[in-house]
Amino acid sequence: YLIELETSSTITSGLQSSLHVFGGTKFHATTGTPLAKLVDIQYQPAGDAIVENRYGKGYTIALAADLIGSIVLIQQGIPVTQDGQPAPDGSASIDDDILKTEDGFVLNWKWDRTPIVPSTQPVFLEPITDELRELIVKAILRCFEVKSQSTPILWYYPRGLKSIAMMSHDSDHNDQQLAWSLLNVTDQLNIKTTWCIIYPGGYIPEFYQKLQDWDYEIALHFDALTKKTYTNWTQDDFNYQHQWLIQEAGIPTLKSNKNHYTRWENRLEFFHWCQAKGIEVDQSKGPSKHGTIGFPFGGSHPWYPIDDNGKRINVLEINMLTQDLVITCPVFYGRGLIDSVSRHYGIAHFLFHPAHIEKPNVRDAVIDVVEYAHLQGMEWWTSEQIGDWEQKRRQIRIIHQRHDRFTITSPISVGSVTFIFLIPDTINDFSIQIDGRLIDWKPISIYGCNFAEIIIDIAANQEIKVQL
């Protein structure tokens, strides 16, 4: 764990999670300024964690922990081959004879959870991997600041959005009347959501058509729990259910999936199943118990799994925060989780089952979480929208010509792309030129630094020249 963070440094200020890390190099600095200390799992001293040092005109930041390896391990977990260890306080009995994503999580029940408000059961309230990423980003930004240089950053979302929200619905039991009831609620709220449909049964054709006409997403809810015909944890059964839903809903393709009861086995095989069928987004990593609510897989940012050979598997994972406010946990949990996501510029993914929409206070809970997210400036996107945007965003390239000149290119057209440019404190007259023309920019503060924000459209295969 990283502890005793120096709050006066932009690198280590503002971090609230336990900063649980795995692996790295132990050292005790004999020169420089320690910004954080390292302790082992028993909270015994293990050396310095972060040290900055100046030597002549040079500047270094030493990070003892393997931050990238820690992020990957927390996100992907260990292979799920047996039940995980339950929470000692009884809040998460994950030893339920059902193999699921939580059985592979690696965080600590004691040190990595905190209550949303005092006197409530602890949950994974703070996104640890988000903050480990921020440490890396802020260390790099600090190096640029020390050298009085700017650098461009391709922001996470279009139109200057700082974070977004997503709502999914698992169609368990496929009750048509309850489905209409939930659709009516989200339609009145003017948000688009993702419907994960479970085999067998489904809904009437008119319902699927309404979802398509109103720009909702139809996704798969892979059932490997009931162990009836075609509902076992096999690639063949996954393929069968995938094809069934395409025919059932009358759609050409499926882009997203969430596993029923967050079922999971082994480590990466399911991502390969998804990739083979063209599923580009999965939503299965998340809590099935009260004590694992929040960020048991570390973060609010979507991520691509890394295969054992080091290559990316092209299936974006969007972690789920909680299921069914009111049914699973009090309504105010939703606001607390949104606050955590907002602080880290991530995605707040909530699951509401149609099966619960007519139960007392559930409808009001949906309304409350939607309206509160809007107050934080979040838009509600479908899983498919998030996946499509991330695919587009990752094709954009920034090429450094020299310290104040850059080119931006993309093989496809992408609209309303957000870029932010670091403004070091030593620069008093900051300006941005695009293709030789001065443009207006918006001052913003992110990661404890000052930035200039611009929003531009990028045409396919056209070079945009940027000069600062």
Model-derived regions, located:
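An acidic, glycine-rich "communication" segment
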Residues: 1-58
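Alpha-helical scaffolding within the catalytic cores
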Residues: 46-47, 148-154, 178-180, 200-212, ...
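Beta-strand-turn-beta hairpins that frame and shape the catalytic cleft
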Residues: 52-61, 160, 309-316
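Extracellular ligand-binding/catalytic regions of CAZymes and related secreted enzymes
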Residues: 55-59, 65-159, 360-397
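Catalytic grooves of carbohydrate-active enzymes
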Residues: 122-125, 169, 277, 308-385
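Metal-dependent polysaccharide deacetylase catalytic core of the NodB/CE4 family, i.e.
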Residues: 162-165, 175-177, 184-271, 276, ...
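Surface-exposed beta-strand/loop patches in extracellular or lumenal glycoproteins
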Residues: 410-428
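C-terminal beta-strand-rich structural cap/linker in extracellular carbohydrate-active enzymes
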Residues: 445-468
